[in-house]
Amino acid sequence: MNVENQTPNVDHQEIAKFEAIASRWWDLEGEFKPLHRINPLRLGYISQRAEGLFGKKVLDVGCGGGILAESMAREGADVTGLDMGAEPLQVARLHALESGVAVNYVQETVEAHAQAHPGLYDVVTCMEMLEHVPDPQSVVQACAKLVKPGGHVFFSTINRNAKAWMMAVIGAEYVLKMVPRGTHDIKKFIRPAELMHWVDSTPLREKHITGLHYNPLTDHFKLGPNVDVNYMLHTRHDK
């Protein structure tokens, strides 16, 4: 595992994918439309499970162009956004400036950030990022190191099975064209049991898991108990 960040836990091809379309991050009808659509659900889940965000120090790992980071800052959180993509961070900084929202954006790996700032944050979020790095377990361990005792860490990713491949790759990329082709690689998807196993190797403990569902007939997203495709996991640092 890459906890000490001796070799940066970075997939440059993955970064290039998002840098190529970063200028359209805040286009509500563009490639990131699904992220804008699900953001209220993600924000609501995080805020509820963390017992509110106001006044809390929050880190958004893999923040991209800042959709979730900005929304948490609007809730009154002191937010730092972390990403390795220069172009998405430039977009995020500009949008925050235009929106009048204070977010501190940093270009750094989560492992390096954990080395420099252990136990700094009340809440850490890592949304749709684990499936885009070579060593996702290293990210989980770094997130655990960054949060205070009693603090909250949230992960979201995609399950690895035939249904997830049909929905997240074939359906979303080829049929519905919700995201660009090549966005996802089923080999990098993560089963909930795998993620929980990584969590159990840290001081984090699972508190709740929920699925994120899309109905193409109604064009509607909702949270629910089925974790066959997209899911979010709430964990808490054992005091």
From Swiss-Prot:
Residues crossing the lipid bilayer are none
Q: Which InterPro entries match?
A: SAM-dependent_MTases_sf (IPR029063), UbiG_MeTrfase (IPR010233)
Instruction: Name the EC number(s).
Output: 2.1.1.222, 2.1.1.64
Q: Which GO terms describe its molecular function?
A: 2-polyprenyl-6-hydroxyphenol methylase activity; 3-demethylubiquinol 3-O-methyltransferase activity; polyprenyldihydroxybenzoate methyltransferase activity
Concerning SUPFAM superfamilies, the annotation shows: S-adenosyl-L-methionine-dependent methyltransferases
- Keyword Zinc-finger belongs to the record: no
Q: In terms of domain of life, where is this protein from?
A: Bacteria
**Reactions catalysed, as given in the entry:** a 3-demethylubiquinol + S-adenosyl-L-methionine = a ubiquinol + S-adenosyl-L-homocysteine + H(+); a 3-(all-trans-polyprenyl)benzene-1,2-diol + S-adenosyl-L-methionine = a 2-methoxy-6-(all-trans-polyprenyl)phenol + S-adenosyl-L-homocysteine + H(+)
Task: Name its pathway.
Answer: Cofactor biosynthesis; ubiquinone biosynthesis
Task: Determine if Iron-sulfur is one of this entry's keywords.
Answer: no
Q: What is one process in the GO biological process aspect for this record?
A: methylation
Quick one: which residues bind S-adenosyl-L-methionine?
42, 62, 83, 127
Key words, A-Z? Methyltransferase, S-adenosyl-L-methionine, Transferase, Ubiquinone biosynthesis
Q: Which PANTHER family match?
A: METHYLTRANSFERASE, UBIQUINONE BIOSYNTHESIS O-METHYLTRANSFERASE, MITOCHONDRIAL
Family the entry assigns: Belongs to the methyltransferase superfamily. UbiG/COQ3 family.
Chain's role: O-methyltransferase that catalyzes the 2 O-methylation steps in the ubiquinone biosynthetic pathway.
Protein name from the UniProt record? Ubiquinone biosynthesis O-methyltransferase
Q: Please name the source species.
A: Pectobacterium carotovorum subsp. carotovorum (strain PC1)
Q: What is the lineage of its organism?
A: Bacteria, Pseudomonadati, Pseudomonadota, Gammaproteobacteria, Enterobacterales
Q: Which gene encodes it?
A: ubiG
